[in-house]
């Protein structure tokens, strides 16, 4: 991957939120445990916004490019607008502790595509503690699903507690796993200090309407 000079630093620790310059794309991180539905959500956002905005996607996997390959296979964006970072270690390291590879990949996307409006940065699957460096993304979505039971929001963790949007995914499976969606919504509200939570099923709502509304609100606020 090409290397570039940056006017931002490559910290090994989180720093205050980056300041977006005029014309820079909004960067939204999408994180969450393995199998929670991150890639499917990214695909849904791309399908809904690709005709009205200039988009790109950056995925993170440990040893493969599987998530990027999935997005290309399903043609959610042109291939050149989807790229991957192979982290080679703990997934959270590349999105939080040493974000150099992700910053380089973002620079490559910006250089290849004029006037990008939005870059979605998907993390590799990790646990409830994984969050993005504020030097990498402007806002972040954290995706959990009902398969782990309705106790997951109650367990908290930085992703659940501090993400800008929490998504409780695969709600259509709740009856099959005995998860109480009202309990999940209540517990999420209790730990999130007013930050929004969305309960959704991409099976029932393939457009991810509530998440899409939130993404559009972030784009509008970014100007």
Curated annotation (Swiss-Prot):
Biological process (GO), any one: urea catabolic process
Keyword NAD: no
Subcellular location(s) of the protein: Cytoplasm
One GO CC term, this protein: cytoplasm
Pfam families: cobW
Binding site for GTP: 32-39
InterPro entries named among the record's database cross-references: CobW/HypB/UreG_nucleotide-bd, P-loop_NTPase, UreG
Molecular function in Gene Ontology: GTP binding; GTPase activity; nickel cation binding
Keywords: Chaperone, Cytoplasm, GTP-binding, Nickel insertion, Nucleotide-binding
UniProt-annotated stretches for the region Disordered: 1-31
Biological role stated in the UniProt entry: Facilitates the functional incorporation of the urease nickel metallocenter. This process requires GTP hydrolysis, probably effectuated by UreG.
Protein family membership: Belongs to the SIMIBI class G3E GTPase family. UreG subfamily.
Subunit structure and binding partners: Homodimer. UreD, UreF and UreG form a complex that acts as a GTP-hydrolysis-dependent molecular chaperone, activating the urease apoprotein by helping to assemble the nickel containing metallocenter of UreC. The UreE protein probably delivers the nickel.
Protein name: Urease accessory protein UreG
């Amino acid at each position: 991957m090409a290397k570039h000079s940056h006017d931002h630093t490559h910290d090994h620790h989180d720093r205050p939120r980056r300041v977006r310059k005029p014309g820079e794309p909004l960067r939204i991180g999408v994180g969450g445990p393995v199998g929670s539905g991150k890639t499917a959500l990214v695909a849904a956002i791309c399908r809904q916004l690709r005709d009205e905005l200039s988009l790109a996607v950056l995925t993170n996997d440990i040893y493969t490019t599987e998530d990027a390959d999935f997005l290309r296979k399903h043609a959610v964006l042109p291939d050149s607008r989807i790229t991957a970072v192979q982290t080679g270690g703990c997934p959270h390291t590349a999105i939080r502790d040493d974000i150099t590879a992700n910053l380089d990949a973002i620079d490559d996307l910006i250089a290849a595509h004029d006037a990008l409006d939005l870059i979605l940065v998907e993390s590799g699957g990790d646990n409830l503690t994984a969050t993005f460096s504020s030097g990498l993304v402007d806002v972040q979505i954290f995706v959990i699903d009902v398969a782990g039971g309705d106790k997951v929001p109650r367990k908290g963790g930085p992703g659940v507690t501090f993400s800008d949007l929490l998504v409780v995914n695969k709600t259509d499976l709740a009856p099959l796993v005995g998860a109480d969606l009202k309990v999940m919504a209540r517990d999420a509200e209790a730990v999130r200090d007013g930050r929004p939570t969305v309960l959704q099923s991409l099976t029932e709502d393939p457009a991810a309407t509530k998440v899409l509304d939130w993404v559009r609100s972030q784009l509008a606020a970014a100007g």
